[in-house]
A protein has these predicted regions:
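Conserved cofactor-binding/catalytic machinery of classical short-chain dehydrogenase/reductase
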Residues: 54, 90, 134, 176-179
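Core catalytic loop region at the nicotinamide-binding pocket of NAD(P)H-dependent oxidoreductases
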Residues: 190-211
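Glycine-/Pro-rich loop/turn segments that contact NAD(P) or position catalytic residues
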Residues: 74-166, 172
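Substrate-positioning beta->alpha
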Residues: 171-186, 196
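NAD(P)H-binding glycine-rich loop region in Rossmannoid oxidoreductase-like domains
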Residues: 4, 8, 29-31, 35-93, ...
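Non-catalytic, hydrophobic alpha-helical segments
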Residues: 12, 68, 138, 148, ...
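Glycine/proline-rich active-site loop of Rossmann-fold NAD(P)-dependent oxidoreductases
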Residues: 157-162, 187-196
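N-terminal Rossmann NAD(P)H-binding glycine-rich loop of SDR-like oxidoreductase domains
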Residues: 1-25
């Protein structure tokens, strides 16, 4: 297995890179700012400069990677087109390139509540709408996929067990980014994770379960 992580310098993306490196899985990290990436990513990660909005740069970044993990997201800005460009157009470009390269598994970090049009987050330039459109594009692509919809993302880790459920079943809760990274990486080797949307939060009240059981329980 060789992984290409896109959105690798974001808060979730860098944790995905770290998780892959810890497991000795070779990583190519697609980054826009090489100097910044060198500061925050493990030296073991191979850094490739590119941009999901420049399709010609994506294929070279994926290269011989067998799996792609996408954790892109628009930076906070006043650009009303940012979610459309990054969450939809960029992901679409990435899916097309992954398909062309024969990638075996595509993991997308999305969000809870993407199916709720009137969710307050859609006040921010319809961000959830475009994430949902990206999900649907992946599902129709023919690629083997896992779509991970985390709850509110927290930078600090905790020991709370993960709660995993199917699409449009969890509507509140939060989860540490490190746990989201673990879910994404575990999905690569769990047959039960293939072609599923999984919603994830963490909860002190939940019971510990194996990864196999967590993914298997999602219909």
């Amino acid at each position: 297995m060789k992984a290409c992580v896109v959105g690798a310098t974001g808060e979730t993306g860098k944790r995905i890179v770290q998780e892959l490196v810890m497991r000795d899985i070779p990583v190519r990290a697609l980054v826009r700012n090489l100097e910044y990436a060198q500061e925050i990513l493990p030296p073991a990660a191979e850094l490739v400069v590119g941009d999901v909005l420049k399709p010609e740069s994506i294929g070279a970044a994926i290269a011989d990677s067998t799996v792609v993990l996408c954790a892109t997201g628009p930076r906070p800005s006043f650009d009303p087109t940012a979610p459309y460009k990054v969450d939809y157009e960029g992901t679409k470009n990435l899916v097309d390139a992954a398909k062309q390269k024969g990638v075996e598994h595509f993991v997308l970090v999305s969000s809870l509540c993407v199916s709720q049009f009137f969710h307050p987050l859609n006040l921010f330039w319809l961000i959830l709408v475009w994430k949902k459109q990206a999900e649907e594009y992946i599902q129709k692509s023919g690629l083997t996929y896992t779509i991970v919809r985390p709850g509110g993302l927290r930078n600090e880790d905790n020991s709370d067990p993960i709660v995993m459920s199917g699409a449009d079943t969890i509507f509140e809760g939060s989860i540490p980014r490190t746990k989201v990274a673990e879910v994404c990486v575990e999905a690569l080797s769990e047959p039960e994770a293939r072609n599923k949307i999984v919603e994830v939060v963490s909860s002190a009240e939940a019971r510990d379960q194996s990864w196999e059981q967590l993914f298997a329980d999602v219909g």
